[in-house]
């Protein structure tokens, strides 16, 4: 499967770490949109990312924002996922195409 590069954004910190051969930890994002209530969801997501940093790696929370796959999120993007009004879809591999094509927001899951 290939993806149009316009629909994939790798956070600069994640990209730089990968280029240097550093440690990156991929994190699903459903805990933010579907796992915990707002505003605790965004707080817990930030704590998890900090725990990854404390362990010597860079966190790469993965989500779809406005039809673009994001690998590594900004604080504003975490907040979009955590906002109940953002209409975030729970996304597994079977849902990628429709969510991307519709330009929606999606939270990734490993299921």
Question: Which residues fall in each region the model found?
Answer:
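N- or domain-start disorder-to-order transition segments that initiate the globular core
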Residues: 1-21
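Short, charged beta->alpha transition segments
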Residues: 11-14, 84-85, 110-111
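A generic secondary-structure signal marking the coil-to-beta-strand transition
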Residues: 21-23, 58
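Conserved phosphate/anionic-ligand binding catalytic regions in large, soluble enzymes, centered on
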Residues: 23-37, 109-111
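Glycine-rich nucleotide/cofactor/substrate-binding loop typically near the N-terminus or early
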Residues: 29, 34-36, 42-99
